[in-house]
Amino acid sequence: MRTHVAASSVSVLLLALVGLSSCDRPRAIDDARLRSADGDTANWLMYGRTYDDHRFSPLSQINEQTVAKLGLVWSRELGTTRGLEATPLVENGVIYTTGSWSVVYAIDAQTADVRWMYDPAVPRARAYFICCDVVNRGAALYRGKVYVGTLDGRLIALDAQSGTPVWSAATVDTTKPYAITGYPRIAKGMVLIGNAGAEFGVRGYISAYDAESGKMVWRAYTVPGDPSLGFESKAMEQAAKTWNGEWWTVGGGGTVWEGIVYDPALDLLYFGTGNATAWYRTLRGNGEGDNLYAAAILAVHASNGELAWYFQTAPGDNWDYDATQPLMQADLAIGGRQRKVIMQASKNGFFYVLDRETGEFISGAPFVSGITWASGLDPKTGRPIESPTAFAGLQPIIVSPDPGGAHNWNPMAFNPATGLVYLPAKVGTQALHAPDSQWKYDPNRHNIGSDARYEGPLKAKLRSLPPPTGELLAWDPVKQSAAWRAKYPVVEGGGVLTTAGNLVFQGRADGILAAYRATDGQRLWEFNAGTGIMAPPVTYLVNGAQFVSVMVGWGGPDGAYNAPERGKVKPGYGRILTFALGGTATLSVPAFGHTEPPTPAIVMNASPETIHEGGLLYGAQCAHCHGADAVAGPLPDLRYATKAVHEQFETIVLGGARASLGMPSFKDLVSVDQVRAIQAYILSRAGEAAKPPSK
């Protein structure tokens, strides 16, 4: 790991850069301190800073008048080229954050020195069973411990001073394709954690563990299991009535992979659930039923996990419209009275405002244009008014938004002074959904049920549609309308921070970190980080001076499927950057990737039919990690594979020769002849790229 720290004569930095290393041990982070986190302006103790998840800081040294003087103080490389999505936590001048492969770091906020690092040694072959890169969205702090969920399903408690493991709990059945990429949530002496894996075929649930001992307190499932074995609760018994067929043999889905929040006053936990398995309702059963509680927002009692209420955003989901996007609590004046609400900008393109006590639908509206799956929401119930063209049984359709959504996991922020919610929005994303009528559950592969070999006319139509766009959106949740939109030249924007300085901070895929005026969206400052940014910034005090830190590192599903943004998105070496007023450090960005077009490393005689077949197989088996059309982001671009790699191609793909690097064996998925067809396709793509452009 490399560090770059600036020497500065600016007085505010001198104040920040003395004396911290010998500070007293931090004040205990207990339940009372978490409940009063809003008044603790110096620190960032939780994922969204406070239990309401506003990501609003009362700090204002950095404001619309002074932000032009904001500069880099230090950067710390983290030794990865994979995605970085974590929200850093800050307590008493120490940054606690997570990186690729669930690695945890404790970093001195003034010097960038790594106080300790903990690597949970996740088996690299596990990468195949992870939907969207080997990412982690952050840790939790409580009573002298740091908690992290790992990609292989463990929940680990570390000593905050040393990084030494205190306890570890297996939260999943490791024989099944579960994973954890989300952050833990602390509530009432418990650590709450969910999991991912619905694309492969698992049953979703959320678990509560005793923060001191690591023993499980309760577990609440989100979709019903095998009825012949009985139901764990009345909620599961009722949910089973909305399913048909033998859904439990595939797991059912509905995983809680993100977005757990807690209201201490109501003693309720809120979380969203993911898609059902398979994606398409006609493959899950007869195409009927709401399939509870997949693609829904749930509230459960914190003491026992019992269901309090639910609201389903995509009944009978057919489009991968998870409801796992960030949830945010607020008390808003609506209709002449104060309402306790919970809000979500959903994947499906609608912004929801619900009563968080009862789950009552208050309001909802589209926050992006071009939605085709639904014409609107029922004004009383909030149930979507599904478009006739959004479901055609087993026939292919084009629908907007795409499975990446109009908004995904990237955190949004709420500023109480403006009354606005700020979020990264994607406009005009489209997807071709082609259900595979021959699909059968296979525990060794993706089980979304999509026909990756579809070659019909809709494929050409999809390619002819206008490309999507990205924007930072300021949304009024009371009026359910946009206050302003700040367009940017890429589709993907990172998470958001807002402050009392009338500022909104956000990074984006092209590596730009920008500050906007919160009231009107005017861009006031920007910094080129050299690498795409997905994570949200945080802000805090070090000896009275305000700092801003952000994780920088491109990856996730868009690292592979960002075809509309090729040439704009910047993969690179992951790092954490820290800024302050008067910072003068410079950023050295090592070269990453290839600057010259690829050339085929070997000659392989293959017919056009074989190459075409290889392209279909590549799309089904390889594009998930190595990129659509054999054009990769942070992972190896196979068009540049060397002669040595091609000579070992079969050994790597079928023999698992690089399993320790995250490339598992595909021997149960493809034959030798199919591997050769994939190889021929990759070489063909390298040859196409090497050709001079036609005049």
Question: What role is predicted for each listed range?
Answer:
Residues R25-L72, P227-M236, R383-P388, A460-L462, ...:
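Blade/loop signatures of beta-propeller domains
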Residues D31-A32, F592-L617, A689-K695:
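Electrostatic cytochrome c docking/interface patches
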Residues W44-G48, G83-V103, Y128-R154, A179-R203, ...:
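Repeat-blade elements of multi-bladed beta-propeller folds
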Residues R76-T87, M117-A140, S168-Y183, Y221-G259, ...:
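Extracytoplasmic beta-rich repeat domains
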Residues D108-T111, A121, D159-S162, A211-S213, ...:
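Short loop/turn segments that connect beta-strands within beta-propeller blades
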Residues G149, K667-K695:
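C-terminal capping alpha-helices of c-type cytochrome domains
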Residues S588-T610, A623-A641:
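His/Cys-centered metal/cofactor-coordination and adjacent catalytic loops
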Residues G615, G627-F666:
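Gly/Gly-Pro-rich "capping" loops immediately C-terminal to redox-active cysteine motifs
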